[in-house]
């Protein structure tokens, strides 16, 4: 397994729509293992392949408490087939939008069909935080970031701040 670089906003790749995975093989499983290791190291609770520069419809999640055993979940070609009409608000963060957070309203339940790590077709009824995380990560697959749900002013302020941080880091690295 290897750590992958996590892309940060602003980056055009993060706004691309990810492609459907045609075949689950050892290379794809290695990518998912790398994604999981990268997510844990960041640390985070979810990561989409596009966040490491791979435009494939893959997400990894683990919302288990830090002090408990890990519970990694792998979703290939996830598709929300139904959402609740009731909403929950969670403070969302994102590894691609470092240091920023905002309260976002999302359906409190969603039904998702997907392929698992081995390419087996599955369905899950996700509730609460798991539902929020799945929706957040699926948004990534469609080029959407949580900041896109904010007002134009708030979003532009965050992007400006991230751009300044990137430039400062580039100056240090060069």
Task: Indicate residue ranges for each PLM-predicted region.
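Positively charged
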Residues: 1-174
């Amino acid at each position: 397994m290897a750590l992958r670089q996590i892309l940060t906003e602003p980056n055009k790749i993060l706004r691309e729509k990810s492609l459907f995975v045609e075949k689950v093989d050892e290379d794809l499983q290695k990518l998912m293992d790398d994604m999981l290791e990268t997510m844990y190291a960041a640390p985070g609770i979810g990561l989409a392949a596009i966040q490491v520069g791979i435009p494939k419809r893959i997400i990894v999640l683990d919302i288990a408490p830090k002090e408990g055993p890990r519970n990694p979940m792998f979703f290939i070609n996830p598709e929300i087939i139904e959402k609740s009409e009731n909403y929950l608000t969670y403070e969302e963060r994102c590894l691609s939008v470092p240091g920023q957070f905002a309260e976002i309203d999302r359906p409190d339940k969603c039904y998702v069909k997907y392929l698992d790590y081995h390419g087996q077709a599955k369905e899950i009824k996700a509730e609460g935080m798991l539902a929020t995380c799945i929706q957040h990560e699926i948004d990534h697959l469609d080029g959407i970031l949580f900041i896109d749900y904010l007002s134009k002013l708030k979003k532009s302020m965050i992007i400006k701040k991230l751009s300044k941080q990137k430039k400062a880091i580039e100056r240090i690295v060069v």
